[in-house]
Amino acid sequence: MALCHEMLPGAKIGPAPNISLVYPASCKPEDVLAAQNYNAIRNWLYLDMAVYGVYNNLVWAYLEENDACPEFGEGDAEALKNGHPDFIGFNYYNTATVEASDGTEKLDPGADQQTARGEAAVYRGYKNPNLPTTEFGWEIDPMGFRATIREMYSRYRLPMVVTENGLGAYDTLTEDGKVHDQYRIEYLRKHIEQIQLAITDGAEMMGYCPWSAIDLISTHEGMVKRYGFIYVDGDEFDLKTLDRYRKDSFYWYKKVISSNGEDLTD
């Protein structure tokens, strides 16, 4: 970041991690500590490094306990300290909920970054009974979006831009070339409403970029997990025509951006 500012004095630069605010499963102090631990590892490790130029203290203590501290070369610490972002970009899909670990958690090779499964002696993943889930098991938490924005702005006091937010689903193309994805419209509407509320809370937002404009290959599920406003006629086993079809959400979001987010109606 320092090099960017040196080479391009008028440029703005910032990190763009994937952030999932972590809730404790209960008000038990042990669960609260577990949530703090996972928040530090899952979220603040990246942003503390980018914004403040130092490792998060909880993560560093964990690394020391496990003899896993990185080695710093000459000038590394200074380079980190001198990198000052102008903004924070972040991806948001859901929150996570955890409880205290009993030390028996095993690494789950099928887990992904959006499903908190557990880490021995650190936290144990907990299914939040208050939240619905997508067809792929990710919890849906629009209000958690607002909570995430509030927490990030309180910690870092930098303007933010949402670099990814969207719903992966099994979309169906009708015989007349339509995709009726009202579920995606509802998902996006509720999340955009929460951004607007976060702005009234005092958070500074630069922009919102939904994921995504067009169906593409998901790293875990391939083409079957669709995010786009535009349907691509093809799947993992058959390229088909690769023709493009505008989904209902395409026309809805066109209206949203033409009104600068003021019109979220159907």
Regions found by a protein language model. Give the residues of each.
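Active-site region of glycoside hydrolase catalytic domains
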Residues: M1-D266
